[in-house]
Amino acid sequence: MTDTYKNYGELKVHEEIEKDYKISISNVGSQTTIIAPHGGKIEPRTSDIAKHIATEKYNYYCFEGIKEEDNGCLHLTSHNFDEPNAAKLISGSDFVVAIHACTGNSGTVYLGGTDQILKNSIADELETKGINISKDHPRFKGLNPNNICNQGKRKKGVQLEISRDLRDDREKIGLISEAVQAALEKIESA
């Protein structure tokens, strides 16, 4: 998909906050932030998953499409996602996990990002919960240093691309959330 806008500055000139999109932020003072930069109707259920993972323990940020239709025009590629509130929250975080959606019903979470230790820990926890994972899909590598998930204090993070069938299954959402939480707890306490 080709983005309609090249960055947030361009998007905000043409789209109206609280009419076309909204921004949800919870800063609980954690060193970990969970983000859904394509939430709401842009990539359905990603906001719900991010908030489910964050609970009241981790910070979260969700950029959510709320238009009646054509929410895809609000999509900013992750390496162009520069909304200032997201940048501020993430820049103060040691660990960043971005929740994304991919098409298809493969029953798979595709992991990307530059934080290899956290990515491997999340992958292990997902597999323990019976969730299929892939760490090598060419479309979901998340290695661009400008990717929003790689903009934390340590300049590395993780992104999860979750297939539609998993996002539509409440039980699977719970398992994915538990797996990410368990991985974060292990990494934070190491």
What residues fall within each predicted segment?
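N-terminal catalytic or cofactor-binding beta/alpha core of small enzyme domains
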Residues: 1-190
